[in-house]
Amino acid sequence: MIYDTLNNLPNYLGMSDNLDAVIEFVMARDINNLPAGKTRIDGDKAVVTVSTVTPQTSDKALFQRRDDHLTLETDLEGSELFEVSLGELTPTKPTDEAADLTVGTAGTSIAGMLCEGRFALYLAGEPYKSGLKAQGCGK
């Protein structure tokens, strides 16, 4: 997992071709003006998804894991908490192969705050939760 500011995003060029495609896409435009839904980048190399999330408490959210790709998240407005598991994911239902998505429970995790100007990059195979409500912050 990488947690940093969007200003530092270019520092991560060269980690993977797919990540490079996302970084170049994000840095070349005002991401606040992207349309809702999915935007494909460079064919099927990467996808940018813009969506509205209603934060939920951590105990109501399952961890998710994507085995074949990285996931980069940022908040265009507001803030949310995220968690990254330090242990293995125990699936609660079969993997959705088409979406490269496995959901389930996991042990000990670390938490962080995602807000405007920051990003979290979840590595392939890394269980994480996002869109979590920060206690007392209204988001």
Which stretches of residues belong to each language-model region?
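Surface/interface-facing alpha-helical segments and adjacent flexible terminal/loop regions used
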Residues: 1-45
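A short glycine-rich, His/Asp/Glu-containing loop-to-beta-strand
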Residues: 36-57, 67-76, 83-84
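Short acidic (Asp/Glu) patches
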Residues: 51-67, 95-108
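A short local loop/turn or secondary-structure capping micro-motif enriched for an aromatic residue
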Residues: 57-58, 90-93, 130
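Short, conserved beta-strand element in jelly-roll/cupin
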Residues: 67-80, 86-88, 95-104
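Short, surface-exposed secondary-structure edge patches
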Residues: 72, 110-112
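Conserved metal-binding segment of the jelly-roll/cupin
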Residues: 104-105, 112-133
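Short, compositionally biased
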Residues: 133-139
